[in-house]
Regions:
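Active-site loop-helix segments enriched in His/Asp/Glu that coordinate
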Residues: 109-111, 122-151, 170-179, 198-202, ...
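Short acidic, glycine/proline-rich loop/turn micro-motifs
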Residues: 127-130, 254, 368
């Protein structure tokens, strides 16, 4: 297929790095290093695995020392591949996966101006260690300092790595947000799901959101470990002690990806966060988009039914029609296999982000392969999706 030529250089909203084994320990305070660190150790079979102290971690237990090539799953995700054919793995120490100057050279070859840079392991460890709150905060700050070392928050105005933020401790979250903002961060990664008994839009967290709004930082709700396997899947009789490789189909459907993302975004809208902070922006990254039309229809319905005939004004804390609030404040990066045209029709080209998920195997082999999914868009809409929306979020 011959793709149309572009009169602009795209900006990718979803690139990843593969972390080295010392991503949490390099800068970890000494008192946490024995027994309270996210680290790599050998299991009984002699294989490397991620552990917290002596306990094997959950979702991302195996280390990603060898990974499948970029786009390796694309035929399978498109319904055309043979699931029994496994591509040959490549080392995660491949220089462009680990080193920012090599990645910039890769961006040049790929025809990409800039990118949001995101973790692979880093989006998975919060839920594993949240019971030890002090250790969670220490490991997360240490991880962010590794990101600052190896990638930077606005490196050469082309690589925009996002730090991790947890809301389990509001005051810590405010302090860490201020620290990374001072170092040039343009946004942060927020784990999907509730904050262990609270909505992320609970007014308790308003000091944090006020600082995020003031600094102009985008909140990226990236696919990750939401905790649903523990408190939702368990109630359906599912084993809560699973890894990425051992999750059941039911767990993938109900506890991972789209479901926690929808719930999180609905909570931000219905719990009134955007009414209290009207300049906040949220980006849903690597959660897909096929669920967006149904969610907006449901938001419109509950905005009418729950408020007018069921629970009164308190049924929703949103002061405007919820589906309109979503369209104003939420940006969505679809999967390549999603119906991107439907998404544009639903929320407008001004809220759709091009994200390649490179170099993950479930993404595209080369970032601009994504053009195959959007090449029929009008020129102005195409530029919005492929460049301008992300440029505005990053303040490029």
């Amino acid at each position: 297929m011959v793709m149309r030529s572009l009169d602009f250089v795209p900006i990718d909203a979803d690139n990843h790095y593969y972390e080295p084994h010392d991503c949490c320990t390099r800068h970890l305070e000494a008192k946490f290093r024995n027994g309270r660190a996210c680290h790599v150790a050998k299991n009984a079979e002699g294989q490397d695995e991620w552990r917290f102290g002596d306990r094997p971690m959950g979702f991302h237990r195996p280390t990603r020392d060898w990974v499948l090539p970029p786009g390796a799953y694309r035929p399978f995700m498109s319904g055309k591949g043979d699931p029994n054919e496994v591509p040959k793995a490549i080392p995660s120490e491949t220089p462009t996966f680990r080193h920012r100057d090599v990645r910039i050279a890769t961006l040049d070859k790929q025809g990409i101006e800039a990118t949001i840079m995101l973790p692979s392991f880093g989006v998975a460890f919060e839920d594993d260690i949240h019971a030890d709150r002090e250790a969670l905060l220490a490991n997360m700050r240490a991880f962010n300092r590794y990101v600052e070392d190896d990638w930077g928050y606005a490196y050469r105005n082309r690589i925009f790595a996002l730090p991790l933020i947890t809301l389990v401790d509001r005051d810590w979250a405010v302090a860490e947000l201020e620290r990374v903002a001072a170092l040039g961060a343009r946004g942060f990664i927020l784990r999907p799901g509730p904050v262990y008994g609270r909505s992320p839009a609970d007014p308790h967290f308003d000091p944090f959101w006020a600082r995020a709004e003031e600094a102009g930082l985008v909140a990226a709700v990236h696919i990750g470990v939401s905790g649903y396997v523990q408190f939702f899947g368990r109630e359906w009789g599912e084993d809560p002690n699973v890894t990425e490789q051992t999750m059941t189909a039911f767990q993938f459907l109900t506890c991972f990806g789209a479901r926690p993302a929808q719930d999180t975004l609905a909570a931000l809208v219905l719990h009134g966060l955007f009414d209290r902070f009207p300049r906040l922006r949220v980006a849903s990254i690597e959660n897909g988009s096929d669920w967006v039309p149904a969610l907006l229809k449901n938001l419109e319905k509950v905005g009418r039914v729950a408020i007018t005939s069921q629970g009164g004004a308190k049924a929703s804390l949103a002061k405007r029609p919820p589906h309109e609030v979503f369209r104003e404040h939420v940006f969505v990066a679809p999967f390549f296999e999603d119906d991107v045209y439907q998404l544009v029709d639903t929320i407008g080209a001004e809220r759709v982000l091009f994200g390649s998920d490179w170099p993950h195997p479930e993404g595209v082999a080369a970032p601009l392969d994504f053009l195959e999914e959007v090449e029929k868009l009008p020129a102005a809409a195409l530029r919005r999706v492929m460049r301008d929306n992300t440029a505005e979020l990053l303040r490029i």
